Curated annotation (Swiss-Prot):
It holds the Pfam family ATP-synt_ab. It is found in: Plastid, Chloroplast thylakoid membrane. It comes from Tupiella akineta (Green alga). It comes from the Eukaryota. It is a peripheral membrane protein. This is ATP synthase subunit beta, chloroplastic. ATP binds at G163, G164, A165, G166, V167, G168, K169, T170.
Length: 481
């Protein structure tokens, strides 16, 4: 965090410490504002240096405030000095953040040199006013066939990413980061909220390997990473999403770019808020969640939007506790989503990547008056064919293909081609697959699927459609088989 403490220091003293919650007393008339950052620097009884930053959450009366710590409170004692910085937590923003890993305070944690940032912004900011919003509905083309055709993303929208372990979430995220940089000249910000440290490290290593982060030329990197992992105090996990969002807002508002904001995992943001709420002594609401759940979620989500300057499109991994979609945490998240991308283990086990489930994934953008009649009818026909194939699978398993009618056999053959054509080679997976990545425009995607549906390509083998970009590549591949 960029800490320029005001010259006339407002110093209080710690009166109580309960885990990550700190109470502090200040002189009459000198109480810090809600959300102000407080800093404790001193030496503990073992003679070790301690430095803790916290954020004011409540004004208790009797010249006391209650704050939540952003770091571990080990070694703090009653009576220690606590300094009001006079402003909220402030983090570095701009091009210098690209290729780097930050914590909730905006401090680099990747072991590289300090960030020399001339620009910094507070993490608590108002959402853009309605007059500044770009309310035009526009598709955000990703270059990934299955997404653009069946569950298109909205520019400045929010997308939920559902999928268990090992079905290709990370690779899909990295491909989106790569494609937004190439096709839209945009950048990405990744907020790791309350997930495993190992996963954060793996993502960083894979990004370096695939060229999304370029160590030799950091400014050519396409992403900034902000981590507040599982082992961090709840205060840090609750605020790390806002730190990532603040960095993304700068790219949108000042650099006027299209930004992709990844939040992994939005459920952990709610979970951290619930822990903080209990620590602050608030009465719990349904299922033990915080009473302010909808307000906290709204405060974060309303800042993620398109303005006349640029857009922030957010992709949020959603963990569903005990697979219960009615749980207040996922239910509150769903209210904000424009599209869902569901990854399927069944498709992944068949080797079809990206393993996006074409029937489970949805989008509010898939309406004829938004995407146009041609796109809409093509998407509906693809879904219809795949659904019919799904219904016939039991019959095929028991009696075999020969027992189907001529019409149904055609449907099955086309559905299998569609299923394979929905796969495509990724740029970021080139190092693993050996196949060069492909960015497929929406126009080419629609043309390709229309030709499969009309039966023009019934004589081509289904293997020709596997892991190719456009239809021309499938035809060329068929000639070599």
């Amino acid at each position: 965090m960029v800490l320029s403490i005001q010259t006339n220091k407002n110093v209080g003293s710690i009166t109580q410490i309960i885990g990550p919650v700190i109470d502090a007393a200040f002189a009459p008339g000198q109480l810090p504002n809600i959300y102000n950052a407080l800093v404790i620097k001193g030496t503990n009884q073992a003679g070790q240096e301690v430095a803790v930053t916290c954020e004011v959450q409540q004004l208790l009366g009797d010249h006391c405030v209650r704050a939540v710590a952003m770091n571990a409170t080990d070694g703090l004692m009653r009576g220690m000095n606590i300094v009001d910085t006079g402003k909220p937590l402030t983090v570095p923003v701009g091009k210098v953040t690209l290729g780097r890993i930050f914590n909730v305070l905006g401090e680099p944690v990747d072991g590289l040199e300090a960030v020399d940032s001339k620009e910094s912004l507070p993490i608590h900011r108002k959402a853009p006013a309605f007059v500044d919003l770009d309310t035009k509905l526009a598709i955000f083309e990703t270059g990934i066939k299955v997404v653009d055709l069946l569950a298109p993303y909205r520019r400045g929208g929010k997308i939920g990413l559902f999928g268990g372990a090992g079905v290709g979430k990370t690779v899909l995220i990295m491909e989106l980061i790569n494609n937004i940089a190439k096709a839209h000249g945009g950048v990405s910000v990744f907020g790791g909220v309350g997930e495993r440290t190992r996963e954060g490290n793996d993502l960083y290593m894979e990004m370096k390997e695939s060229g999304v982060i370029q160590e030799k030329n950091m400014s050519a990197s396409k992403v900034a990473l902000v981590y507040g992992q599982m082992n961090e105090p709840p205060g840090a996990r609750m605020r790390v999403g806002l730190t990532a969002l603040t960095m993304a807002e700068y790219f949108r508002d000042i650099n006027k770019q299209d930004v992709l904001l990844f939040i992994d995992n939005i459920f952990r943001f709610v979970q951290a808020g619930s822990e903080v709420s209990a620590l602050l002594g608030r009465m719990p609401s349904a299922v033990g969640y915080q009473p302010t759940l909808a307000t906290e979620m709204g405060g974060l989500q309303e800042r993620i939007t398109s303005t006349k300057d640029g857009s922030i499109t957010s992709i949020q991994a959603v963990y569903v506790p005990a697979d219960d979609l009615t749980d207040p945490a996922p239910a509150t998240t769903f209210a904000h989503l424009d599209a869902t991308t569901v990854l399927s283990r069944g498709l992944a086990s068949k080797g079809i990547y990206p393993a996006v489930d074409p029937l489970d994934s949805t989008s509010t953008m898939l309406q004829p008056w938004i995407v146009g009649e041609e796109h809409y009818s093509c998407a509906q026909n693809v879904k219809e064919t795949l659904q019919r194939y799904k219904e016939l699978q039991d019959i095929i398993a028991i009696l075999g293909l020969d027992e189907l009618s001529e019409e149904d056999r055609k449907v099955v053959a086309r559905a299998r081609k569609i299923e394979r054509f929905l796969s495509q080679p990724f740029f970021v997976a080139e190092v693993f697959t050996g196949s060069p990545g492909k960015y497929v425009s929406l126009k080419e995607t629609i043309q390709g699927f229309n030709k499969i549906l009309t039966g023009e390509l019934d004589d081509l083998p289904e293997q020709a459609f596997y892991l190719v970009g456009t239809l021309d590549e499938a035809v060329a591949k068929a000639a070599t088989l």
